[in-house]
Structure formats: structure tokens, C-alpha cells
């Protein structure tokens, strides 16, 4: 089992040249020149998967549905807590017509050592901005939601509050052990509709021909809404997955029944919102 680490920890150790330069070959490429490996089979030169070709995938198994706009005094995390599953595949004869892959049979705490998931926040376009005409040098979209394009330049990750880098927890999901990244304390500073992009990398593994740690997989989550305190509809009962995560040690609030905001709580929180905006 792994505890979630603070966001302040990772910017220090995510200096791939510092971590790996002693073992990287002299002709290895730095991150800005190396090919993108997201979602592709990766042959590892160093680390626990050295000599093997591995493909990683992420999928969101629990999406946030709603949240209250962050205030310094009254921070309420997204609900339910967003969670993504990591799947790993051994790849054989990569890059040939005989390429095949086989998912790992066992997932456990030891296998999860070194894996870290991080995320980014994107606002959903509203109204006419959803159908804007691209300019002659327009950037390509990174994702689409209901016909609306999402662009990297619109990323609003600095509006997130909480742990944006987490390590995996091993839980039973769909009848088998699974490595799950849980973002249990995220809040958003602004109201509106948003989605999350999840990305995973392995701190202890270095791809062949690379100097830097590589992002191995990514996925985009479902849209969710952030409400003002006045408009917040309340919290539904906790999901079965949330209860299972809490049972195995992830720090989460569990509710057997829904929780609606009372008038008294709304009035008190409104003053917090005003304090936060000052």
C-alpha cells in the first residue's frame, strides 16, 4: 500500500537527467527531442522492466461528478474521488507483423513501486467558443468532448488544489487485484465544467535510447461541474468503489446516505467565498 505524496515532493525528483544520466547511453535523446511513447510499447533499458517491452494503459474507473468551488477555509474535494486503473502488458515481437501482447496476471504493491500518476485540468468550452474557426497556425486539439475541441494551451492545472501526483493503491476491482490511482483531495478554484487528463510514468525505469523518464500512458476523464456554494446541490451517497478504497486504507470520507447543503452551511460558506476572493 502506498500513501499519497504531496505535490511539493515531485518537482524535485522529476529531474530525469539527475536520476538517470549516469546510466543513459551517450547517444540517448533528451525529452524535448525523444519520440512520444504515450500508449506505445516501450522497451526498457534500465529499471525493474529492463530488457522487456511493456505497454501501459490508463482508464478512468471512477469519474468525479461535482464539487464546490474551493475556498481557503472550506475546501471540499471532488466527489466521488476520481480514480484511474493502470494496466500493463508484456509485448512480444514489437513493431513486426507478429506483434502480440499479454496483460500481467498479477498486480500488487511491489509491481506498483515507482509508478506515479499526475493530472491536468481543462475547462470545457462554452457556447460559441466550442465552434471557433481555427487559424492558419492553429494548434491541433488534444481531445474532443461532444464535438468540442480541447487544446493544450487551455490547460488550467493551476486552478487545482490538492495532491496532483499520487502513487497507486492495490485494490480488488472487477474480481481481480488492480493498481488504482486515487485523487482523494482535489478541489477546483473556479466554477464551471471541467475534465481531467491523467498521465502515468515510472520513476525507476528508463526507455532504451532516452535520457529522461517517459510518460507511458494517458487518458481523459468524464466532465464534471464545479458549483458555487449557493448552487451546490449536495453530495450523493458514496460509491461502492469509494467504500472499497476506504476499506483498504485510502483516506476518504464515506457516506451511506446523501448529504445536502443546509441554509446555515450555505450562509457560512458564502462568507468563505468572499474571503477567498479578496
UniProtKB/Swiss-Prot annotation:
**Mind listing the GO biological process terms from this record?**
sporulation resulting in formation of a cellular spore
Domain spans labelled Velvet: 51-255
Query: A Gene Ontology CC term for this entry?
Result: nucleus
- Location relative to the cell: Nucleus
Query: From which domain of life does this come?
Result: Eukaryota
Induction profile: Expression is up-regulated during fruiting body formation.
Role of this protein: Velvet-domain-containing protein that probably acts as a positive regulator of sexual development.
Protein name per the record: Probable velvet family sexual development regulator SCHCODRAFT_28806
This protein's species is: Schizophyllum commune (strain H4-8 / FGSC 9210)
Cite the source lineage. Eukaryota, Fungi, Dikarya, Basidiomycota, Agaricomycotina
